[in-house]
């Protein structure tokens, strides 16, 4: 039987826009998602899980079920409704109250400054493609670092990679642009500059606590490891989703291999990446200052060589087999592999998490420590009305197998200090609405009642014994 360390964090993850609701309440400014959902979907993030009002219940459940850490994000537009300028005191008060309740319940808050929710005013002006947004973000970060002294763990961004991908490659995030690789890389780079500036400011000003970043790191494999085209496709996919942002985080520059891949993709698809020389100094100054890396991991992908046009079909319905992903000059994802997958065509491959952790350890030895900041199974949960619970054995099995490879990585020298299941309770899903559930606690979105799932009881026993069984 495998065990986890005594000081290991057994956490649950949330995000402001996916959990809080109250999207227009108490002075909160609009974000691009408000309009985008209203215009394109049959659902909105109102009231989501009503965490804005229900957080005392969720934190009480956390304490009761052994969850000793919680990922929370601050809604930038709840603090600065326009992203800059006048502060909203009710937003500040809300987060003080929330963090106070976390500590009262002995649940350590790991607080993210940006989780997919740039204020609408800045988003409509180019988001992070506009370099002014970098400076506005740093000012917002400085305000939070100074205001919320009760926070011990800060994360600048959640998933810089999927933000650029969602906005400019897949087109499922506002502004809904597809296949614009130049914007993808420019967004990634500019956000990494914003991260580096915020981290340097945190350390220069001597704030207490720790600061890091959360990256989504889906592992990429060649479908046929003996086929050079498949190997190259996996390398290029890895550069887009992982290596570009990891290089910026820990090398303070982009390796020759990374830039060759970027230039190849841009030469095939058009566009250019603009990196002022000053940016390299900013990245270099911060590369050793990250106290931790958060890794979000759900799946791996298998890549084939491909010489056609870009075409992505996003499976938002949970009808298995509805996905297509092929990129001009990069490769195509092969879904017909002997690996289980979710209804949303996400490949379930725990070894991919082990390989990704050990890749960070090997290639970026200045990583310091790792938290697995998101991992979990999206499922069409069947609520048992009589017993008021969900028998989510598939979720337990998924989490168990990923925790086992985390234990293996620790054994093999990786400094992994905690795990945050996505998600603490059921929350709103960006491109799936309310059907796709991840939580330990089932949320009846009509009544906002919470009900522990079978996985919550399993997680409680795990947190108490540290034994994976």
Swiss-Prot record:
Q: Where does D-galactose 6-phosphate bind?
A: 18, 115, 158-159, 296, 429-430, 436, 438
What EC number(s) does its UniProt record assign?
3.2.1.85
Which of UniProt's keywords are assigned here?
Answer: Glycosidase, Hydrolase
Keyword set includes Hydrolase: yes
Question: Where in the sequence is the active site?
Answer: 159, 374
**Coiled-coil regions listed in the entry:** none
Q: In which pathway does it act?
A: Carbohydrate metabolism; lactose degradation; D-galactose 6-phosphate and beta-D-glucose from lactose 6-phosphate: step 1/1
- Give the catalysed reaction(s), semicolon-separated: a 6-phospho-beta-D-galactoside + H2O = D-galactose 6-phosphate + an alcohol
Provide the GO biological process annotations.
lactose catabolic process via tagatose-6-phosphate
One protein family per Pfam: Glyco_hydro_1
Q: Name one GO molecular function term.
A: beta-glucosidase activity
Query: GO CC terms on record?
Result: cytosol
* Enzyme class, UniProt record, top EC level: hydrolase
Q: Which HAMAP family match?
A: LacG
The entry's family comment says: Belongs to the glycosyl hydrolase 1 family.
Q: What is this protein called?
A: 6-phospho-beta-galactosidase
What is the protein's species of origin? Staphylococcus haemolyticus (strain JCSC1435)
Q: What is the lineage of its organism?
A: Bacteria, Bacillati, Bacillota, Bacilli, Bacillales
Give the gene symbol.
lacG
